[in-house]
Amino acid sequence: MTDYRAGFVSFVGRPNVGKSTLTNALVGEKIAITSSKPQTTRRAIRGIMHRREGQLILVDTPGVHRPRTLLGERLNTLVESTLGDVDVIGFCVPADERIGPGDRFINERLDDYPRAKKVAIVTKIDSARKTQVAEQLLAVSALREWEAIVPVSAVNSIQLDTLTTELMRLLPVSPGPLYPDESVTDEGVEDRIAEYIREAVLDGVEDELPHSLAVTIDDLVERDDKDLLEIYANLFVERDSQKAIVIGKGGSRIREVGATAREPIEALLGRHVFLSIRVKVAKDWQRDPKQLGRLGF
C-alpha cells in the first residue's frame, strides 16, 4: 500500500501572479478572494485538498513586495513566518511576464528556508504564447535546482492534476489526515464574509484605494420572523475622499457592492442574507499600530 502523505504547501511570488486563483482551483472552492489589484491577499489562508493518497494543505500568502507602510511590513513578516513552517514552497511566476528583480529577490530568499522543498510553478499559461511559456520554463530552470517545474493554468484547469501529484509526492508520510474530511479551509465564517465584501469593493476602484480598504463584521443576527440572517459590516477607508468614492453618488456604489457580495455569501451560508455595510474613516490605519491591531493585523 502506498504511504499516506499529509503536509503544508505555500505558494509565494510577487503580488498578482495568480496564487489565490491557483489555490481556489486546486481546492475546488473559492476560499481566497481574487482581484487584479496587487496585495489582495492579506492573511495566510489555508485551503485543504483531500485525496485518497493524502491531504494537501495549501497556504495562500500575501505577495512579497517592498513595503511602504506598517501593514506592508506585517504582511511580509507573515509570509516569512509561514514559509518557515511549510513542507513545500511553490514559487509562482506568470508565463506572460519576464522574470524581474522582484522574482529574483524572492528566489534568493528561498534559501532562508532549507527545510522546505522547492517547486517552480509557471502560472497563467493560458495568457501566453507557447514560445513564451517555453522561454519562461528555461528562465525559471536557470534560477536554481527545483524538485519540479510545472506550467499551469488555474483558469482553464490545465496541468492541475500534474501539479497536485508533484506536490503530494514531496509531502511527509503521515499516519492520517491533519484536517477532517469535510474541511476545505480553516477560515472562520465571519472572516470569509468580510473577505467577500472586500473583494466586491475592489472591483473597479482606483489603484491607490485597494490598500486603504479593510472590512470587519460587527454582528450576525438571526431573524425570528423569517429565515434570514442579518449581517452588519464595517468598511474602513483612510480618508473622507475615499469614503465618497466607495459610497458613490446617492449610495449607488455601496449598493452595488452589497449586491455583488451577497451572492458568494449566500452560496457559502446556503441561505438568504440581509447585508448592511457602514463606511467609516480610520485615518491612515495602515501606518497606525493600534488601528492595525483593531482591524486584525
From Swiss-Prot:
Pfam families on file: KH_2, MMR_HSR1
PANTHER family per UniProt: GTPASE ERA (PTHR42698), GTPASE ERA, MITOCHONDRIAL (PTHR42698:SF1)
Keywords: Cell membrane, Cytoplasm, GTP-binding, Membrane, Nucleotide-binding, Ribosome biogenesis, RNA-binding, rRNA-binding
Protein location: Cytoplasm; Cell membrane
Binding site for GTP: 13-20, 60-64, 123-126
Membrane topology: Peripheral membrane protein
Ranges of residues in domain Era-type G: 5-173
Gene Ontology cellular-component terms listed: cytosol; plasma membrane
Stretches the record annotates as G1: 13-20
UniProt-recorded Gene Ontology molecular function terms: GTP binding; GTPase activity; ribosomal small subunit binding; small ribosomal subunit rRNA binding
Signal peptide as annotated in the record: none
Domain KH type-2 positions: 205-283
Keyword match Transport: no
Residue numbers spanned by region G4: 123-126
Upper classification of the organism: Bacteria, Bacillati, Actinomycetota, Actinomycetes, Micrococcales
GO biological process, one term: ribosomal small subunit assembly
Organism: Leifsonia xyli subsp. xyli (strain CTCB07)
SUPFAM superfamilies, A to Z: P-loop containing nucleoside triphosphate hydrolases (SSF52540), Prokaryotic type KH domain (KH-domain type II) (SSF54814)
HAMAP family, alphabetized: GTPase_Era (MF_00367)
Quaternary structure (record): Monomer.
Name assigned to this protein: GTPase Era
